[in-house]
């Protein structure tokens, strides 16, 4: 019987693409820098590529958060300090939230029956404020962020460090819900969790990763669990 829910945040509870677009627009305006649609799309590509390298252990967190702007500015011949831009971007990022349709309402209902924990890669200073802004934090017992855990999904060490902080935790009684087949689903399967792939963006399946459930919206999650 499922008693614990481990929830990813970005593109599971919050629409990160919208949040990123909003924060980047405000950052570049604040710093007097031009921002085109092409630059916005390229920033997303670079960020995804760097986080994938990070997930494989090929680069550090700082390589990702500062390197993405350094690479972007080099490609578009912009003169700006990547560190200043990153800090400004993070400040704007944590000031807003774009909840995925039905997520908050589903959390409120699920929290009556399950112990809910957040499990996310990223920075605690942006993850938690965005959940607070969205009005979702009251439904969580705790939120575990790779930045403070000292490991990141899909590493088994990340999950085991989270498990150690959850009272009476049993992996056999837990389900992870997330949008990423590799970090959430493959990672969860490797440590004995039930898995639910939240395929919000309708990504192609990977035949080597077999989630227990696949959904595209929160009403389907509720149908499984309630």
PLM segments and residue spans:
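N-terminal helical cap/lid subdomain that shapes the substrate entry/recognition surface
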Residues: 2-101
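Catalytic-core regions built around general acid/base machinery
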Residues: 102-113
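Asp-based, Mg2+/Mn2+-dependent phosphohydrolase catalytic module
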Residues: 1-5, 18, 34, 108, ...
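Intrinsically disordered, low-complexity segments enriched in small/polar residues
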Residues: 14, 41, 87, 112-115, ...
């Amino acid at each position: 019987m499922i008693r614990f829910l481990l929830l990813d945040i970005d593109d599971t509870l919050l629409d990160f693409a919208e949040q990123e677009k909003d924060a980047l627009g405000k950052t570049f305006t604040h710093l007097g820098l031009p921002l085109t649609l092409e630059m916005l799309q390229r920033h997303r590509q670079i960020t995804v590529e760097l986080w994938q390298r990070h997930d494989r252990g090929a680069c550090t967190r700082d390589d990702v958060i500062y390197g993405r702007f350094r690479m972007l500015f080099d490609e578009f011949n912009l003169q700006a300090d990547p560190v200043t831009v990153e800090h400004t971007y993070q400040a704007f990022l944590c000031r807003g939230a774009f909840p995925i349709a039905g997520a908050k309402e589903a959390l409120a209902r699920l929290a009556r029956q399950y112990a809910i924990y957040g499990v996310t890669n990223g920075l605690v200073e942006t993850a938690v404020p965005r959940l607070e802004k969205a009005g979702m934090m009251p439904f969580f017992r705790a939120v575990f962020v790779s930045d403070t855990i000292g490991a990141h999904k899909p590493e088994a060490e990340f999950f085991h460090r989270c498990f150690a902080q959850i009272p009476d935790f049993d992996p056999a009684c837990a389900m992870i819900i997330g949008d990423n087949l590799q970090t959430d689903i493959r990672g969860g399967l490797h440590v004995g969790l039930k898995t639910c792939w939240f395929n919000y963006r309708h990504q192609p399946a990977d035949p080597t990763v077999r989630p227990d459930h696949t959904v595209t919206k929160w009403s389907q999650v509720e149908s499984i669990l309630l």
